[in-house]
Amino acid sequence: MTVTKPRSVQGRHISRYDWVPAAAGWAVGVIATLSLLASISPLVRWIIKVPREFINSYLFNFPDTSFAWSFVLALLAAALAARKRIAWLLLLTNVVLAAFLNAADIAAGGNTAAQNFGENLGFAVHVVAIVVLVLGYRQFWAKVRRGALFKAAAVLVAGGAIGILVSWGLVELFPGSLAPHDRLPYVANRVIGFALADPDLFTGRPHVFLNAMFGLFGALALIAATIVLFQSQRADNALTGEDESAIRGLLELYGNSDSLGYFATRRDKSVIFASSGRAAITYRVEIGVCLASGDPVGDPRSWPQAIDAWLRLCQTYGWSPGVMGASSQGAKAYREAGLNALELGDEAILVPADFTLSGPDMRGVRQAVTRARRAGLTVRIRRHRDISDAEMEQTIDRADGWRDTESERGFSMALGRLGDPADTDCLLVEALDPDDLVVAMLSLVPWGTSGVSLDLMRRSPQSPNGTIELMVSELALRAEGLGISRISLNFAMFRSAFEQGAQLGAGPVARLWRWLLVFFSRWWQIETLYRSNQKYQPQWVPRYACYEDARVIPKVGVASVIAEGFLVLPFSRRNKVHTGHHPAVPERLAATGLLHHDGSAPDVSGLRQSAIADGDDPQRRLPEQVRVRLNKLKKLRSSGIDAYPVGEPPTHTVAQAMDADDQASVSVSGRILRVRNYGGVLFAHLRDWSGEIQVLLDNSRLEQGRAADFNAAIDLGDLVEMTGQMGSSKTGTRSLIVRRWRLIGKCLRPLPNKWKGLTDPEARVRTRYVDLAVNAESRALITARSAVLRSVRETLSAKGFIEVETPILQQVHGGATARPFITHINTYSMDLFLRIAPELYLKRLCVGGVERVFELGRAFRNEGVDFSHNPEFTLLEAYQAHADYRVWIDSCRELIQNAAQAANGAPVAMRPAGGGRLEPVDISGVWAVKTVHDAVSEALGEQIDADTDLATLRRLADAARIPYRAQWDAGAVVLELYEHLVESRTEQPTFYLDFPTSVSPLTRPHRSKPGIAERWDLVAWGVELGTAYSELTDPVEQRLRLEEQSLLAAGGDPEAMQLDEDFLQAMEYAMPPTGGLGMGVDRVVMLITGRSIRETLPFPLAKPH
């Protein structure tokens, strides 16, 4: 997959002359191409003879046959297009000289009309070209290697001298008719003069084949000099100790995301940092490609700065930017900077918590491990720091001896320095034979704080099959004890192609692509790497290559092959010891003094504190008011004031202080909400949970300090402890006259508007803590909710019920028909469900003889979120032995009425009135009771009962425009009619009795009416508040109903209950006749307070920002 976006690198503004390099390159390139064709083909030479002679005479050097000149012009064209300044200088020099010659000829006169036209036209073209090149000077910013001009001149002189000497020797051996005194001048003219001197100046001629050889020597010298001149600057500087130390610090702070991050410490790479020092890119330059490895290191927020600095560097030296092994996050950052991304393959990640050798998918690994263990192999795992120097030397010798290449390969996914003293956190996994001899090893580098990434894999030719599988498996199985949660194995190139091509129904292109990869795997380990990782059932994480333009993909690919060591060029410096001389660390970071010259990691806490002290926290983008408060906090700390001290209990709450006598000494604590400063006297409003009080700070009454000190140190929202005497202000306002005060909590973020508070409902949900701090109504709601919960417990306890707790994590979801949340327990490698209801466990207690039991706790249903639904909610379930569903009518009404009394002071429910107000509605007394069929009949205007057939019910539903599903039975259609026509239209609290049996699988059939279950629902103002059953205690009937539910679940119904065999077995021990109640406590709170579920819950579920 490739995604593209035009790159717009900051810092280089688009100029009106931005087209000049490309135009100059095209112009010279056309001449180079035609010159090459003319040198090859006499036909082309004949076709272009007239324009070529004109261009050669008046505009630009254009000989009819010269391979050397064609090649030189091609290099010049490429250098111009790459914006190299030396190419601009050469072209400008050539044009200026040509213009001077044309001007001289024009001034000399005596030419024909055709010659005058050519010279005037050529001079005009040269003048225009000079002006354009001068105006476009700033567009040629790319540098070449230092001293390239002198090196090129030296190569030309040396090459020319060698060519002249060799040619002189040849002409002495085969002089032909050439006079002895003309031989050296003749060959010099041919080799370095390109035969510009007239042949008639020399006496005689050598053999014809010698002239071609003399020209070839000169061409080779010129070509070599041109290559040296236009070569891109190499990145000669590698990591210094300070650079490596900074990178290690960034890895400790931000290295958890990229498994390849530690490989950025390879010392044969160069590095460039973001200006802030919080991100860096390591790279190497090969064949004009600046190849970055993996993601930028450091804070992802600073990646754009690092990428921009890297792209600027590429532009400066004319390098083509390329990236190998970027993660999805890194590729996105490079793409946003304008590069393109191409998926290369996938990295195999093992999660030890999910790893197991059991199961059919792991059969191959399990058998390999068994073979290795039968051969007597054991595994030893150690950190490098725990290995002695002598052992490490032996380890290095073994690794070198078992290597199947002459030197270590790797660039983006290998470290290449086993046993380095700086890598003490690396992990060594060894396989030992029965004689304790090492027969294989893995070395893994750190990946953040809890992961490792494979660096080196070696095995002895004599090691038994399954050795590698044994080491990987043991590492995964022992990972928890080693503090490892992630293991990065090998990289599989083109993994998706193997999988897609092998799928049933794969298209011809996918199959052909897979066949090609399998074919080339005979020479390169493409398929082998994929298969060797796939057998561990890893998570596959994609890795990307990034590039600037599609035309440079081959170049980037070759550069990658060179960097990884698969292709070694002549004069390669791959095995050179790399030590940088010029630190790339920004001065700001170096000035901290935290970096180490030996490359070891700096004090990370010091780096973090230094960044915060500079007011530039890498974790956050801070608003201005927050920065002001942070600066104030810094000043308080520098003055020795602890802004977050140990707590001391106040003597009074605000409410108690307000009731205290005048002159009473009190101490209160709370949040400052308002401040009014009148110079020597300052008034503030302090609020705790019980209320709000005015505090008065008078310079004459303070034991120490002044009111101005309070004003300077305290911001709105700060927590303050006030001690003083109760009294009144001059206006008679009850106040606390402060003697001393103490800051107990500095608020670093400003509170909302003091008059309006939080007006956005979503903001109130997301920042409930702020809402509670400033909104008295929110505090009243949370208090009312607490009163309801307490009242429910007290009412049930007074009736002899005991409260229990049953499991929230359940192996089978049951007790209600709802979609559950699913989680996973690693210890037993099994899925669990967050309970949708505690019913089945409470009934187990009933079987055990607990006659009156209830649970008030959380339940979870993976359903919608609206005015009355939240995925996590509070549910009451209670069971009373030797009772039925009618017993719970009075008990449920009593529960709700008592809760309303506790929350509102009277048995009233708050209902919306006009203007957004709430008004109380009396809910005392006895509530209405109706059967479901009677209520539906009233709504339809036609009598129905449990015997009404399905066709009639469907006809009535169609007439009422109530939709239903074809697979529903009569009971389900009745329930749908009830929900639309009865429940949603109910006002006053009403009990609806006797539901169809088919929609009540856990309910006892009615004792006298077939097809009816003994169940009621309590509904008030369109919301179901609770339900009660005469519980089904017949284990045989219970099994039949749950088996029906399990069949629905197997058929794909996500809300159907599963078969709980343990529950059914418990029921077979006999459960007494029982009446059960289920009540949504959140909805009862809604009824009593008149608010939505999101308002009454302290922390309802909210979408992330």
UniProtKB/Swiss-Prot annotation:
One of the Pfam families matching this protein, by short name: tRNA-synt_2_TM
GO biological process: lipid metabolic process; lysyl-tRNA aminoacylation; response to antibiotic
Keyword Nucleotide-binding appears in the UniProt entry: yes
Cofactor details (free text): Binds 3 Mg(2+) ions per subunit.
UniProt xrefs under CDD domains: LysRS_N
This protein's UniProt keywords: Aminoacyl-tRNA synthetase, Antibiotic resistance, ATP-binding, Cell membrane, Ligase, Lipid metabolism, Magnesium, Membrane, Metal-binding, Multifunctional enzyme, Nucleotide-binding, Transferase, Transmembrane, Transmembrane helix, Virulence
Record: residues binding Mg(2+) 1: D1017, E1024
Phosphatidylglycerol lysyltransferase: annotated span: 1-603
Keyword Secreted recorded: no
One GO cellular component, as annotated: plasma membrane
Cofactor: Mg(2+)
Alphabetical list of Gene3D superfamilies matching this protein: Bira Bifunctional Protein, Domain 2 (3.30.930.10), Nucleic acid-binding proteins (2.40.50.140)
Localization: Cell membrane
GO MF entries: ATP binding; lysine-tRNA ligase activity; magnesium ion binding; phosphatidylglycerol lysyltransferase activity; tRNA binding
Record's bilayer topology term: Multi-pass membrane protein
Lysine--tRNA ligase as annotated region, ranges: 604-1105
Function text: Catalyzes the production of L-lysyl-tRNA(Lys)transfer and the transfer of a lysyl group from L-lysyl-tRNA(Lys) to membrane-bound phosphatidylglycerol (PG), which produces lysylphosphatidylglycerol (LPG), one of the components of the bacterial membrane with a positive net charge. LPG synthesis contributes to the resistance to cationic antimicrobial peptides (CAMPs) and likely protects M.tuberculosis against the CAMPs produced by competiting microorganisms (bacteriocins).
Family: In the N-terminal section; belongs to the LPG synthetase family.
Protein name: Lysylphosphatidylglycerol biosynthesis bifunctional protein LysX
Organism: Mycobacterium marinum (strain ATCC BAA-535 / M)
